[in-house]
Amino acid sequence: MTRKDDYYNRAKQQGYRSRAAYKLKQLDEAADLINEGDTVVDLGAAPGGWLQVANELAGEAGTVVGVDLQRIDPIEGVETVRGDMTEDATREKVRALVGEADVVISDMAPNMTGEYSLDHARSVHLARMAFETALDLLAPNGDLVAKVFEGPDTDDLRADIDREFEYVRTIHPDASRDSSSELFMVAKGRLTAPVREGDTLEVEIDNLGDEGDGVAKVDGYTLFVSGAEPGDAPEVRVTDVKPRFGFAETLE
């Protein structure tokens, strides 16, 4: 039996609407995405396999919302919105349901043409749509999963996502077909800090941290500056950004 047939048959036996349900299960096992009580938004959710898994993981205390242009048959405990996520009206409906999301997930894929470069470009476009939606909906420290077909534009997409999250990794779940070029960008820890890695700026050192680094505040955000002393006002380059604090080095 092929891997495709195995997951297809398992989905039928276990009541999942698509074999893709196992992709989300494996992504969650690898990256600890959805926890009890989480609010989850699934983009391009039809027919609902990912919604079923997200609902299991978030539990009764969680909130799960699926968005798609196609109708999604009802799933107990899951809200659905029929619409285009790029339109303001659809986003407003979702925000009214969830406020802020803990996790945004997307298994969206383009209609395949068989032309590799075109299919890749369209998949990157859909992944960017998911990324932009996540920036709008995610709570601080929230997570994103977005599917993309591997190709020449994948690295640029990853770099853009990486700038807005604590870290990004790519995962090819076992449930994906062997012949598929699909991979999933898994971005953890939505950053809301006023600085990003690589930024240069002038700061004022107010005091010293426990490890002896200078401490500066940027719009209330704590930046630790190695080798700086209280009273200094150096120009620095940001070297690492965490949800609640970051690190920088002085420029010569």
Swiss-Prot record:
Enzyme Commission identifier(s): 2.1.1.166
List of catalytic residues: 147 (proton acceptor)
InterPro entries for the chain: NA-bd_OB-fold, RNA_methyltr_RlmE, RNA_MeTrfase_FtsJ_dom, rRNA-MeTfrase_E, SAM-dependent_MTases_sf, TRAM_dom
GO terms for cellular component: cytoplasm
Enzyme class: transferase
Domain annotation TRAM: ranges: 194-252
Protein's cellular compartments: Cytoplasm
Keyword field: Cytoplasm, Methyltransferase, rRNA processing, S-adenosyl-L-methionine, Transferase
Record GO terms (molecular function): rRNA (uridine-2'-O-)-methyltransferase activity
Keyword rRNA processing (UniProt): yes
Database matches in PROSITE patterns: TRAM
Binding site for S-adenosyl-L-methionine: 48, 50, 68, 84, 107
Catalytic activity from the UniProt record: uridine(2552) in 23S rRNA + S-adenosyl-L-methionine = 2'-O-methyluridine(2552) in 23S rRNA + S-adenosyl-L-homocysteine + H(+)
HAMAP family assigned to the protein according to its UniProt record, in alphabetical order: RNA_methyltr_E
Function: Specifically methylates the uridine in position 2552 of 23S rRNA at the 2'-O position of the ribose in the fully assembled 50S ribosomal subunit.
Family per similarity comment: Belongs to the class I-like SAM-binding methyltransferase superfamily. RNA methyltransferase RlmE family.
Protein name: Ribosomal RNA large subunit methyltransferase E
